[in-house]
């Protein structure tokens, strides 16, 4: 976990599960200056600004300095988001918490294979959840 706290993390989507994960990162010592959230909704961005994280409505600008990009959007908008980010994630680790989105689909639309699939559960909303993880063979344990 300590290595993650030294990374710049961008969340594409700032809904409930993203907010729970952000809260967990902050609670474990991640500086808020290392967290960026891109969300199209002004009310969500305002709520996240109260946590002192960077917010924007521009997905491309949000990922510019990211080491890790967390896909936290609704399944119905995922394809559009992935097309927008296609070819822009070289060297970045992609983590998807999108329900029903498999690694092959995400990798094909992004043109990358450094992807981890995470399935958080609702207790994560109160920092007590368990998460299932799956990664392709080329993703290191770091």
Residue ranges and their predicted role:
Residues 1-57, 61:
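NAD(P)+-binding Rossmann beta1-loop-alpha1 motif at the extreme N-terminus of oxidoreductases
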Residues 14, 120-123, 136-139:
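Short coil/turn segments
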Residues 36, 128-142:
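Short beta-strand and adjoining strand-loop segment in the mid-core
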Residues 47, 65, 142:
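Anion-binding (especially nucleotide phosphate/pyrophosphate-binding) glycine-rich loop
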Residues 27-30, 87, 111, 138:
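Generic secondary-structure signature for well-ordered alpha-helical cores
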Residues 42, 51, 59-64, 68-133:
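Rossmann-like NAD(P)(H) cofactor-binding subdomain of soluble oxidoreductases
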Residues 12, 16, 73-76, 101, ...:
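Conserved active-site and cofactor/substrate-binding residues in soluble primary-metabolism enzymes
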């Amino acid at each position: 976990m300590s290595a993650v706290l030294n990374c710049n993390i961008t969340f594409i989507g700032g809904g409930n599960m993203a907010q729970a994960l952000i809260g967990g990162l902050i609670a474990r010592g991640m500086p808020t200056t290392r967290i960026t959230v891109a969300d199209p909704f002004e009310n969500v961005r305002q709520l996240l600004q109260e946590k002192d994280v960077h917010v924007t409505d521009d997905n491309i600008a949000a990922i510019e300095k990211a080491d890790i990009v967390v896909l936290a959007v609704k399944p119905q908008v995922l394809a559009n988001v992935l097309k927008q980010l296609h070819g822009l994630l070289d060297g970045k680790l992609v983590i998807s918490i999108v329900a029903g989105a498999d690694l092959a689909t995400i990798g094909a639309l992004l043109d990358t294979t450094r992807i981890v699939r995470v399935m958080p559960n609702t207790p994560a909303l109160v920092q007590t959840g368990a998460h299932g993880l799956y990664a392709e063979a080329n993703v290191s344990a770091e």
